[in-house]
Amino acid sequence: MWAALPLLCAGAWLLSTGATAELTVNAIEKFHFKSWMKQHQKTYSSVEYNHRLQMFANNWRKIQAHNQRNHTFKMALNQFSDMSFAEIKHKFLWSEPQNCSATKSNYLRGTGPYPSSMDWRKKGNVVSPVKNQGACGSCWTFSTTGALESAVAIASGKMLSLAEQQLVDCAQAFNNHGCKGGLPSQAFEYILYNKGIMEEDSYPYIGKDSSCRFNPQKAVAFVKNVVNITLNDEAAMVEAVALYNPVSFAFEVTEDFLMYKSGVYSSKSCHKTPDKVNHAVLAVGYGEQNGLLYWIVKNSWGSQWGENGYFLIERGKNMCGLAACASYPIPQV
């Protein structure tokens, strides 16, 4: 079946749930805000300063409260800590109807067993560096290029840096919407039928919608086939990551995830259905920590976010719908 879903993704995400009542900000919070401003090279007008300080203090308190409780992951300040939900929703979050082609057909998998852990980052130069999508809902393009970059490197030994901007600008005919969202599975189909994707150096990322400038003579990576993993089949995802390639997937981001810093992310507030997923990422491995199964996931919010741009998320429970729309490309090399 095909599942209609809105895929939202943003270069910056909400860190609070919206406008908040006026807070009495203490000296410690002011000190940390000024340190954070210096770290992130932020400057404000006097009016904006007070507003940003309020947002920061609100998020700071949520982080402190979370970290004092017995959770499987820790939170921390990041580059988005002076923002509210209303602001991010207005500026960065987009919703366009999508069709999750990863639910179209059954993925034929073996019976295992598979290694108890896997990390493609430790298998040589087959995982490209973490990138930053900026203020554009283009997470799906980074998940796509990351998967294909790894596929080409695994098959040929050659590491490329592929052009996310080409996907932003050119893949609309495959039901993608540039900075308004899209799906890796549909982007793989675009590359397959478009006869290739260019390198980033030839088609630089600008983080906004633009006219298509694809030059087929400069295409450097090609897709031979697209593997769409059966809806909610995390065991098939394990097999794919263990034996073949990092896997693109989409899941639902909720407020606590945005402040993730370390540990195994788990949430009781997110949903598990295709219609709720709103961010696309790349599973590059899996493992177990203190009896808790997890995925190793590459994000596209820069290397300063999370664990050097990566995060761990609980595995085996379709956490936040991560098994609702998973796929990977078979490269033509």
From Swiss-Prot:
Subunit structure: Composed of a mini chain and a large chain. The large chain may be split into heavy and light chain. All chains are held together by disulfide bonds.
GO cellular component: acrosomal vesicle; alveolar lamellar body; axoneme; cytoplasmic ribonucleoprotein granule; cytosol; extracellular space; lysosome; outer dense fiber
GO BP annotations listed: bradykinin catabolic process; cellular response to thyroid hormone stimulus; dichotomous subdivision of terminal units involved in lung branching; ERK1 and ERK2 cascade; immune response-regulating signaling pathway; lysosomal protein catabolic process; membrane protein proteolysis; metanephros development
Keywords: Disulfide bond, Glycoprotein, Hydrolase, Lysosome, Protease, Signal, Thiol protease, Zymogen
Disulfide bridges in this chain: 100-325, 136-179, 170-212, 270-320
Propeptide: 21-95, 104-113
Similarity remark: Belongs to the peptidase C1 family.
Gene name of the encoded protein: Ctsh
Described function: Important for the overall degradation of proteins in lysosomes.
Protein name (record): Pro-cathepsin H
Single annotated GO MF: thyroid hormone binding
InterPro entries named in the record: Papain-like_cys_pep_sf (IPR038765), Pept_asp_AS (IPR025661), Pept_cys_AS (IPR000169), Pept_his_AS (IPR025660), Peptidase_C1A (IPR013128), Peptidase_C1A_C (IPR000668), Peptidase_C1A_papain-like (IPR039417), Prot_inhib_I29 (IPR013201)
EC main group: hydrolase
Localization in the cell: Lysosome
Keyword Hydrolase carried by entry: yes
Chief location category: other
Tissue specificity: Widely expressed with highest expression found in non-skeletal tissues. Low levels found in skeletal tissue.
List of catalytic residues: 139, 279, 299
Residues carrying sugar: 70, 99, 228
EC number(s) given by UniProt: 3.4.22.16
Catalyzed reactions: Hydrolysis of proteins, acting as an aminopeptidase (notably, cleaving Arg-|-Xaa bonds) as well as an endopeptidase
